[in-house]
Amino acid sequence: HQLTRRQRQMCIRDSMKKGHVATLDINVLLLKHPPNKFETFEDEIQYIINHDRRNKFIRNLALDLKGNTLILFARVEGHGEPLYNLINSNSLEQRHVFFVHGGVDTEDREKVRSITENENNAIIVASYGTFSTGINIKNLHNVIFASPSKSRIRNLQSIGRILRKGSNKTKATLYDIADDISFKSRKNYTLNHLIERIKIYNEE
């Protein structure tokens, strides 16, 4: 039984009011780049996910945040692995860093779930796909959208993940990292996708 989008939004909003789910703060972090005119969407994605300073910004943000932090990416080899390696090599010993993607079997995903439900300061680097369908984590405090995503449903599913209220949580924060690489009056592809996502956030 599929809820329509309008019903789904009503459910989220009503549940927040009743206190069944955590309240959600959304921070859009718009990174300003030198103007660039990309021929294709793929060219822009490659530029973004291979951008060293951008990836280090995500690493520093994740390491600075307190609480269980989920970092969502779109491409395993292209973005997920480099991010995981960057974060894991800089993390303090007592802070666990996990890497979850479509290739990780169900048992591993369950292990990650049980760890986060027992921990309060872990970092999980995960593919959108794994989390939008597979894992429910009650004890999430922060979510970072590290890769551009234009899928409305996927964004809503990701938001739903964070909103399940843990025993010690009433507030969660979403960090949506976006990129302004506009060339003259021409907005870059992923900036247009951000504008779409902001509409969703405002509707929520």
What are these regions (language model features)?
Residues 67-68, 95-96, 120-122:
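Short coil/turn segments at beta-strand junctions that form active-site/ligand-binding loops
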Residues 13-27, 204:
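Conserved coupling/interface region of RecA-like P-loop/ASCE motor cores
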Residues 1-12:
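Single conserved hydrophobic/aromatic residue that forms the stacking wall/gate
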Residues 36-74, 78-89:
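Conserved interdomain hinge at the start of the Helicase C-terminal
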Residues 45-51, 99-103, 121:
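Short, flexible loop segments at the rims of nucleotide/cofactor-binding pockets, characterized by
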